[in-house]
């Protein structure tokens, strides 16, 4: 029994140390169902969780957020290994999975809870998010309409929203097609839509160079 207790304690400590080496980022890009998949496909991402952020209601429900008045947006929280990927790479994927010109919603989903927002948690994330917005505006040739603000709290969404594209692949594909998401992304981003065909100069942001 004593040996078993020692093993449990050591194992738990090891997991905690590994988790402490991870970082997180929170993004709003319209329907959170559609924002999990592109980040899940990125090497170095450990997990994605759909949820709510930006509002004043504690532990909101989907019904409350959808009805309005909570101030929350649908978001995805991305936990990643900074040794395997970077916040800059997450930003690259984020921008190319949203319509950066629509501040009032995304695609067929309009309203406050669907507006695009980059929620930062550190000064470095704030600086990189601002730099990325300038970079995207330069690439696309006009200003972007995406809010960049500090994260006050993140609340996980209900279980049935998590991994929706995996659990309900047919409904997910139908919703995505009906909403015109891919069509609009192709119009805005061309062959870089959804984060494909990465721009090799994007990570110049890591050195502070935006050229």
Map each language-model feature to its residues.
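Bacterial N-terminal signal peptides
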Residues: 1-12
